[in-house]
Amino acid sequence: MAKDIKFSENARRSLLKGVDKLADTVKTTLGPKGRNVVLEKSYGAPDITNDGVTIAKSIDLKDHFENMGAKLVSEAAQKTNDIAGDGTTTATVLTQAIVREGMKNVTAGANPVGIRRGIETATKAAVDELHKISHKVSTKDEIAQVASVSSASTEVGNLIADAMEKVGHDGVITIEESKGIDTELSVVEGMQFDRGYLSQYMVTDNDKMEADLDNPYILITDKKISNIQDILPLLQEIVQQGKSLLIIADDVDGEALPTLVLNKIRGTFNVVAVKAPGFGDRRKAMLEDIAILTGGTVISSDLGLELKDTKIDQLGKAGKVTVTKDSTTIVEGAGSKDAISERVDQIKKQIADTTSDFDREKLQERLAKLAGGVAVIKVGAATETELKERKYRIEDALNATRAAVEEGYVAGGGTALVDVMKSIQGNVKGDSQDAQTGVNIVMKALGAPVRQIAENAGKDGAVILDHLEHEDPEIGYNAATDKWENMVKAGIIDPTKVTRSALQNAASIAALLLTTEAVVADAPEDDKNQAPAAPNPGMGMGM
């Protein structure tokens, strides 16, 4: 396909137009008085949201050159969301501020490469200062504050704090849509996986249609059990001890399943069989997790172990097991704390090393099941549109809270970035005049989020920023109440990781845009070059 190429000033001007179109749309949502944006869908009612990354992803511009500028800013927002889970609008505002100021200087004759060096120097100094002024999250109230600010709802903040208290900081917290209008929290203790009993005749509670086993032995294997003789010696020993048994296997079929069911119905002993969770390598890993949690051994050919040779001390144990038709929950596994802790560290390392979002999600699920259980926040609302909007906000709040637990928090409302600017301004020097220009560009951009928050609240952003520059650290403008106060004491805080990621990604994308000298895009199709329309077959030939 034919290409259009633009060079130097023309190229940068087109990219800047795209940057402005996307940023001007997204930045209206920043702060407590931020507005909503309505997004058209191909069918059904439009979405209404104030989530920066959702808006950024939905924007495609007609002009190819402008669209590339917009997509680069969208990447800064997306990357911030991937790393920290929030801060997408802040990243967009910072990118626009650095690009705009940088373009002015490049147009005036400054060297873009020198400016880029200055931007990188100033960003590193700002990030170091952010870490110095960061507070550690230590209490449930602080967790609730972070979540409340991100979601603009005290109710949601308290829900997330409750969830984290119950499942721990490494626990999985999932967000689901509720069928009612209330938003509520439920917690699944212990390890749960989505495999139910192989026969309904194994249930112990006919009203709830579930099987409850107290202090059972747990046989864990990746083999298929078809012949009851393979496990008969083991079953006889369990019957003699008067214990119940949970079998987790690749499958239980042939004569084995009806024999187990018959013994259960006769009251010989209590047994429930379920299929092993997951598939392939993930199944092996999950079986090993269950074995470590319960203090058992996976009976597998990979380890040279056979079912017929299995001893009772190779079985796992748990305080309680509940099996429904869809799920199995193991509570109070008897595994050693040291072995579980070692396994948790191993999974954390795998999470840090993986590049796949899907693998990361599955590893985090495994981590949570070992580390403390699963909490489910069920989001309710009166309409589907409101439900989607609330779900977006709660997801953002949850991500922001995790980020705060990881790296701490700083004063919110853009105050921390201005505090950083006040601390390092004058101390950070570029290695050339152009590099110093780059440093100054970042210093000026650090005030952009505060200006935008104030403007969205109907105030003069320049006046608010000027006032803030002469205030003590952590004193900021609370746009929600129109007051000047200590932001940390007022509970207006941002996760350090979110602020840091927003600044680093904005600086990275802005530096790339400023050093762009040529832009190549698909040329628009010319109507004249299109094939002529086929003749109407109904028209006859004149004779």
UniProtKB/Swiss-Prot annotation:
Cystine residue pairs: none
Biological processes, Gene Ontology terms: protein refolding
Location relative to the cell: Cytoplasm
GO MF terms, alphabetically ordered: ATP binding; ATP-dependent protein folding chaperone; isomerase activity; unfolded protein binding
Keywords of the record: ATP-binding, Chaperone, Cytoplasm, Isomerase, Nucleotide-binding
Any single Gene Ontology cellular-component annotation: cytoplasm
Entry-linked Gene3D superfamilies: GroEL (3.50.7.10), GroEL-like equatorial domain (1.10.560.10), TCP-1-like chaperonin intermediate domain (3.30.260.10)
Record keyword Cell cycle present: no
Catalytic activity: ATP + H2O + a folded polypeptide = ADP + phosphate + an unfolded polypeptide
Keyword Iron recorded: no
Residues involved in ATP binding: T29, L30, G31, P32, D86, G87, T88, T89, T90, G413, N478, A479, A480, D494
EC number(s) stated in the UniProt entry for this protein: 5.6.1.7
Role of this protein: Together with its co-chaperonin GroES, plays an essential role in assisting protein folding. The GroEL-GroES system forms a nano-cage that allows encapsulation of the non-native substrate proteins and provides a physical environment optimized to promote and accelerate protein folding.
Family membership noted in the UniProt record: Belongs to the chaperonin (HSP60) family.
NCBIfam families documented for this protein: GroEL (TIGR02348), PRK00013.1 (NF000592), PRK12849.1 (NF009487), PRK12850.1 (NF009488), PRK12851.1 (NF009489)
Subunit structure: Forms a cylinder of 14 subunits composed of two heptameric rings stacked back-to-back. Interacts with the co-chaperonin GroES.
Name under which the protein is recorded: Chaperonin GroEL
Organism: Lactobacillus gasseri (strain ATCC 33323 / DSM 20243 / BCRC 14619 / CIP 102991 / JCM 1131 / KCTC 3163 / NCIMB 11718 / NCTC 13722 / AM63)
